[in-house]
Structures are given as structure tokens and as C-alpha cells.
Amino acid sequence: VVFNSKTLAVTISAVAFPESLYMIGDEFGGWDWKSDGVVEMTPVSKQEGQFWNVRYFSAKKGFKYSPIRDWGKDFHGLKTNDGYAVDGGNCTVEADGFYMVHVDLKREMVHVEPARIYGMGDCFGGWDAGMEAALFKADGKVLKATLVGDGEIRMYAESSIANSDWWTRECIVLDGKIVYRGNGDDQKRVNCTKGQEVTLDLN
């Protein structure tokens, strides 16, 4: 590379990632952006351009994503895509069940896998990530776990493409509702006792 004596001006523009990402489909709003059934995906905390959600999906039912709640910027995949098929321009899964969807716009990845939601903390048996005893189990279209001790309820969704700590995909139960951490601060939590059953209705 040869430079002459003239001044060379270089402008570097940062890529701006959207602050929101939505999922629409046969089961998520019926392809109507005005529907309350459209899913607003949860940001992975402090991870620019990353979003996640866990829902119950039926086999062969189409869905896709958009950074706006409208058509025009919708997509079914990025550079690296796995865990799902594409049919007629829409994503589909092969079997009914709960799935974790993790979209990383920065790394250009869309990853879908069977959902693994784990409890974390004393009421779930400890603070080690991925404990089999702390895994929520499907019961029809809800997920359930029984507390093995007293303590605060904390939960998180595992992801095979995660590049951040478990709490960046955390959720809790507060006032009978599932509350997602997203990009917010550490959450107010509820204390529960051994033997109580926690039921998550994610749809």
C-alpha cells in the first residue's frame, strides 16, 4: 500500500443493532402484526444484538422474525442457521415441544433447540449451572419444577450459542407472572419454600 502526501480521511461507522426483535407466525399472532400474540423477544442482557425466547411450538407451523412490528425487514435466517427447517420462506420445527430461540444479529446466527430452563440457587439445589435436578420438565404445554430447598426463585434459559453468563438470559416469577431480566438491573425476587411447585406457562 502506497500513501502520498495528501491527507487521507477515513470514516468508520459503527453498526447500530435494533433494540427490539419480534417473532410472528401461525401460532404467534396468526401473521397479523396487530395481534397481541406476536412475541416480543427478550434481549440477552448487555449483549448487543442478541435476543431470545422460549415458547411451545407445533411441528410444521411457520414463524419468522423482524426488528420492526411490520413487514419489510422480516427474515427467516442469517449467515449461520441451525435447529430448524425453512418451508416457503418461514421457519419450522420437526416436532411439537418447547424450543429456545436465540438470535445473534452481531454474529449473524439464528439458533433453535429444545428448551432447557434451569432453576438456580438454594431452592433448586445450588448455584452450579446446568444441574439436571434443577431442569424444568414439560407437562403438556407448561414447564414444572419442584423446589428442593428454601430461597429466592431464579431461573435461566440455556443456549448452545451463548457467549455470556447464565443471568443474561434470566427470568423470575413475580406476582404470579414470568418477568424477564432483559437489559434491566438485577431483579426483585420472591422467596419460596421447599416442596412448592413452580409452573411456567410460556405461551
Please place each PLM-identified region on the residue numbering.
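Insoluble glucan recognition modules
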Residues: 1-203
